[in-house]
Amino acid sequence: MALIFANGHSDVPSTQPPIGKQKKEIGRESVNYHPSVWGDRFAILTAHEIEVDEITKQRAEKLKHDVLKMLHNVSVSLQDLNLIDEIQRLGVGYHFETEIENAMKRIYNSRDNDDDDLHAVALRFRLLRQHGYNVSSDVFKKFKDEKGEFKASLRENVRGLLSFYEAAYLGTADDTILDQAIDFTTDQLKSVLPNLNPPLSELVKLALDVPLHKRIERLQSRYFISIYQEEKERNEVLLEFAKLDFNVLQSLHKEELSQLSRWWKDNDFARKLPFIRDRLVECYFWILGVYYEPRYSRGRMMTTKVISLTSIMDDTYDVYGKLDELELLTTAIERWEWAAMDELPDYMKLHFSALLTAVENFEEELSKEGKAYRISYFKNAYTKLAKAYLEEARWASADYVPTLEEYMKHAQVSSAYPVLTLSSLLGMGATATKEAFEWAINMPNAINAISVVCRLKDDITSAELEQQRVHVATAVECYIKENGTTYEETCKLFKQKVDSAWKEINKEWMDPLQVPREIIKRAVNFARVIEFLYRYKDMYTESAGETKECIAMVLVDRFVD
């Protein structure tokens, strides 16, 4: 039961049956996954549906230079802080990374903490922490009264409250004032929301749903462009550039998805493996959340293939495969040889063949750049994942319920996030050095914390289908059996553990790193995707509703004049 592909939603029983002495027969389960909500839509896209005209591209390039001029003139004023924030939230910050980083250095070195404007202080704090500067949260002490409570006057400052709310989610374990800020601002924003008007009300609703720090960047940009165009004090040049750039970038994303959809269709996975979830488009959207910028195009193509093949593997281990067959598949993956396919049942051969072909193609391309060593790291990580899946299948067969400690130690691998994080480095450029792969394979604190977020977010929204078939116990069930708690008590505790894991992620982001932030950001972005997809149910498996709407916003709908 891998984290990234859990199934459905239900309450977990408040008690766990005793560990069975007899092995259960696993495999050949019947799970009614809905078919792809996209069909062949992206596989048959025409050039007209994908391409953006040259006039649009030229206009976007001209506007880009206009925005660049604005950045050359930035100082440390609130107006300039707002400009940088708007550029990033509108999704065009990737064009100006050097200029923004230079501006953030100036802002940090200015040490200007004297402002009594809550919005200004919170915005400065958030931007600096987003860029890795470990500025002190003591700057917010000035907003408390003599009783140690946040001043009552702050309740009237909705923009300030919203900025403070967003900033508070970049806290670490040492930032107790930010924990207090989350409680205070959440209560106040919920209280005033019914009395607000757009666009401010839309910003508040968006933030209360998922805070900015935990949002998928591309989806956040799509929302923010629509909200920003209603702002009275909007920057028209910046707004037009953001819309055009969104359309230009969407064109590239459509082309990538079209190629991947044809690969998926040519392999005929959905028809030949009817027990799997047909979710190629959702997989691409997932990886678009990890990196959307043009320079990561190859990385998206490679990682989407990996995650979609991992989804097939997960359904094989979790739903369809019998234990003796899963033993054979695990051995075949350990060998990484075509000859190993002879030992597999016919239905496993398609997946195994596609996996070997994909990895061989990756290796051939990377060899031309002297980067073939990356594949050995991938094979190592993927083999560990297969072994972890097999161990969970054995647990399910034996009706074994581990302790939470044993479960979580195992889940660091079976969550699939270590292998997916490493996979996201395969197609990257020079930043993904051998040292970066060593960092990823050795499970650093950042990846451990992200695995906790992903594992527990999944298990809190544990699936109804999990309860309808033989399955490995979830973290919730493990804890309930071990401690005799209720479902509600356990979920509350796990949400606290998720919050603590995010604080560790934030700490790792700001502390001196073994690898560049460009590398660690891939791992952090995986956690952001999970925060979105597992807010209240498994929106990967059940992708016909909100998931489809969000994918359409990013990959179908263009901005028009």
Swiss-Prot record:
It comes from Cananga odorata. Its cofactor is Mg(2+). Its main location: cytoplasm. Monomer. This is Sesquiterpene synthase TPS2. One of its GO terms (cellular component) is cytoplasm. Sesquiterpene synthase involved in the biosynthesis of volatile organic compounds. Mediates the conversion of (2E,6E)-farnesyl diphosphate (FPP) into beta-ylangene, beta-copaene and beta-cubebene. Does not use (2E)-geranyl diphosphate (GPP) as substrate. GO terms for biological process: diterpenoid biosynthetic process. It is found in: Cytoplasm.
